[in-house]
Amino acid sequence: MENNKYFGTDGIRGKVGKNPITPEFFFKLGFVIGNLLYKENSFNKVLIGNDTRQSGFILESTLAYGLSCSGLSSLLIGSIPTPAISYLTSYLKADAGISVSASHNLCSDNGIKIFSVNGKKLSDKLENDIEIKLSKLTILKKNIYCKNKYQKVNLINQYIKFCRSTVSNNINLKGLNIVVDCANGSTYQIAPVLLKNLGANVFKLGCNPNGKNINYKCGTTNISLLRKKVLQNKAHLGIAYDGDGDRIIMIDHLGNIVNGDQILYIIACDKLKNKKLNGGVVGTLMSNMGLEIALKKLEVPFIRSRIGDRYVLNELEKQGWKIGAENSGHVILLDHTSTGDGIIAGLQILSIIAKNNTTLKNLCNGINLFPQILINVQIDKENNPLESNIVKKIIEISKKNLDGNGRILLRKSGTEPLIRIMVEGKEENKIIKLAYNIANAVKSVI
């Protein structure tokens, strides 16, 4: 995957209008995917959904046309969360499911995430096969004609029904005041409805998509307004999703952020308490040391995977475990789904709160996260400053400075032309200084 031209850690992503996020490329991609999937006497259908970006509809259409030219039909679902595509692909036994989305990025970006027949994200091997086919694809004739075989379907209610089935029939959120930020994305017509149906009093944010405002000053990457509204309305908690609904971040009644590490801890504790925890839990290289320490106190095994929710899934399947998460808010609960699902993860937390008559703040009391600073440094796609001796030296010095009481992680982003720098430790002032020293070293060799 690291040598792929198009696929990153989570599908394909980029700037709209620049290769590969163009109608022409999406047509070719659909044609290649169709050729790989087409089988005689098979269902030969692919689900396609999108988030609320204005570019999504033309990209979806050209993708569907490319699939048609290879013999596959498309079911166009419209605006729907990415995890819904995963579920519905498996539920309908489609040959594949495709979400046209750039997740938590702004509307100037778009991309795709592809799911196989079992609802899981594509393996590295299959992504590589697609890359090879794309590289060998001869220029398609401009006058190529094929019947565009697609059907528009509304499957939102089926997904709502599925989400509701993941918690007890007896769950009652009456009396809970919840602020919900849907990032002007694809959860806007689902999450508020679900929570109201369960009895909650819902205050809505980010529920007015216009094609251009997805993730803009809202959602999981910008929770300042959510925090403000939780405090203003004296709400019990706040929930933020990202643009395509596969991430969740929460806010407690005091305005504290509750991230993917804490959500994972809460769910693990509940399952342990009810003797339903099968083995241990999986985090990633980015998971906070505080999570590892808290789980160790409970004697719950903990393993770190590579960054990316599909690698969390791979490790869960390898270990035979059921729950894992990224601190960014991708939470995988294999009892229910095989990909990160913000709505389902949120429902589990609300169910735990309701049945224990407690607060989100109280559920987080057993985990103390270390201060952690994240810095992104823009680079050219071909540039790799991580190979620089200057950068290697500053990392070595910084690790000695932490003296075993923290972690340093530098990596190239799998979705954007960035170097991501993470420094974590007990002393906040120290890690801030170390992180900026490393960032300056990276910038000096770009």
UniProtKB/Swiss-Prot annotation:
List the record's Gene Ontology CC terms alphabetically: cytosol
* Record-annotated active site: 103
Does this UniProt record's set of keywords contain Cell membrane?
no
Q: Name the keywords, alphabetized.
A: Isomerase, Magnesium, Metal-binding, Phosphoprotein
Entry's cofactor comment: Binds 1 Mg(2+) ion per subunit.
Please tell me whether the keyword Metal-binding is annotated for this protein.
yes
- Catalytic activity, as annotated: alpha-D-glucosamine 1-phosphate = D-glucosamine 6-phosphate
Which parts of the sequence carry Phosphoserine?
103
Record GO biological process: carbohydrate metabolic process; peptidoglycan biosynthetic process; UDP-N-acetylglucosamine biosynthetic process
Could you state what the record's PTM comment says about this protein?
Activated by phosphorylation.
Under which EC number(s) is this enzyme classified? 5.4.2.10
What is the organism of origin for this protein?
Wigglesworthia glossinidia brevipalpis
Enzyme class, broadest EC rank? isomerase
Q: Name one Pfam family in it.
A: PGM_PMM_III
Record's function text: Catalyzes the conversion of glucosamine-6-phosphate to glucosamine-1-phosphate.
The family assignment reads: Belongs to the phosphohexose mutase family.
Gene3D superfamilies named in the record: Alpha-D-Glucose-1,6-Bisphosphate, subunit A, domain 3 (3.40.120.10), Alpha-D-phosphohexomutase, C-terminal domain (3.30.310.50)
Q: Which GO terms describe its molecular function?
A: magnesium ion binding; phosphoglucosamine mutase activity; phosphomannomutase activity
Classification via InterPro entries: A-D-PHexomutase_a/b/a-I (IPR005844), A-D-PHexomutase_a/b/a-I/II/III (IPR016055), A-D-PHexomutase_a/b/a-II (IPR005845), A-D-PHexomutase_a/b/a-III (IPR005846), A-D-PHexomutase_C (IPR005843), A-D-PHexomutase_C_sf (IPR036900), Alpha-D-phosphohexomutase_SF (IPR005841), GlmM_bact (IPR006352)
**Lineage: superkingdom:** Bacteria
Residues binding Mg(2+), per UniProt? 103, 242, 244, 246
Which cofactors, by name? Mg(2+)
- UniProt protein name: Phosphoglucosamine mutase
- Gene giving rise to this polypeptide: glmM
